[in-house]
UniProtKB/Swiss-Prot annotation:
PROSITE patterns associated with the record: COMPLEX1_20K
GO terms for cellular component: mitochondrial inner membrane; mitochondrion; respiratory chain complex I
Boundaries of the annotated transit peptide in chain numbering: 1-35
Superkingdom of the source species: Eukaryota
UniProt organism field: Mus musculus
Membrane topology note: Peripheral membrane protein
Region (Disordered): 28-50
Record protein name field: NADH dehydrogenase [ubiquinone] iron-sulfur protein 7, mitochondrial
Enzyme class: translocase
EC number of this enzyme: 7.1.1.2
Record keyword Transit peptide present: yes
Subunit structure: Core subunit of respiratory chain NADH dehydrogenase (Complex I) which is composed of 45 different subunits. This is a component of the iron-sulfur (IP) fragment of the enzyme.
Function: Core subunit of the mitochondrial membrane respiratory chain NADH dehydrogenase (Complex I) which catalyzes electron transfer from NADH through the respiratory chain, using ubiquinone as an electron acceptor. Essential for the catalytic activity of complex I.
Length: 224
């Protein structure tokens, strides 16, 4: 019975999605043609005026964020599934360069239990999808950093940990220090501090997961 009822439920969901799209289009058209709603007259009750104010200040989703067809709806759900798998299995590549690496080791210890977020540290860049640059990046180390980054499979992300990795830190004016690892590799998350605590790096990992959750790569590819 469940197998027979599944197609019916799917059709009801798709029809509900279509009606929601039609309603949103009508709301956008009415707002564009009629303009902002006039202020309520004094004769209206307080309840009606409150409802009209709430309707005027309501946030309507943009049409560009909604699926335009059944195929795009399927692509959107597939995008959500892929993003869930990626953010739930982040494998960082350890690239400790200075004292920030000690706090990175602290975060990887059993106290914070990073396994519950799917974070597993790998020693090989070919098995990692996240690079944590922890410490001062010198000019001699910059080519090695770029080479390791190029060996990581797509999609890959970079977390810049500490003031030295973010912008040079104490050694900003040194002749032998790169003033920010974002001059060598693209950075997704910046973790401030000198050195940042293990909790700060943990918060940066959580922010990276939120960023991955918002990605819409398949949807952008499909709309091309």
């Amino acid at each position: 019975m469940a197998a027979l009822a599944a197609p019916g439920l799917l059709s009801v969901r798709i029809l509900g999605l279509r009606t929601a799209q039609v309603q949103l289009r009508r709301v956008h058209q009415s707002v564009a043609t009629e303009g902002p709603s006039p202020s309520p007259s004094p004769s209206l009750s307080s309840t009606q005026s409150a409802v009209s104010k709430a309707g005027a200040g309501a946030v309507v989703p943009k049409l560009s964020h909604l699926p335009r067809s059944r195929a795009e709806y399927v692509v959107t759900k597939l995008d959500d599934l892929i993003n869930w798998a990626r953010r739930s299995s982040l494998w960082p590549m350890t690239f400790g360069l200075a004292c920030c690496a000690v706090e990175m080791m602290h975060m990887a210890a059993p106290r914070y239990d990073m396994d519950r977020f799917g974070v597993v540290f790998r020693a090989s860049p070919r098995q990692a999808d996240v690079m944590i640059v922890a410490g001062t990046l010198t000019n001699k180390m910059a080519p090695a950093l770029r080479k390791v980054y190029d060996q990581m499979p797509e999609p890959r992300y970079v977390v810049s940990m500490g003031s030295c990795a973010n912008g040079g830190g104490y050694y900003h004016y040194s002749y032998s220090v790169v003033r920010g690892c974002d001059r060598i590799v693209p950075v997704d998350i910046y973790v401030p501090g000198c050195p940042p605590t293990a909790e700060a790096l943990l918060y940066g990992i959580l922010q990276l997961q939120r960023k991955i959750k918002r990605e819409q790569k398949l949807k952008i590819w499909y709309r091309r």
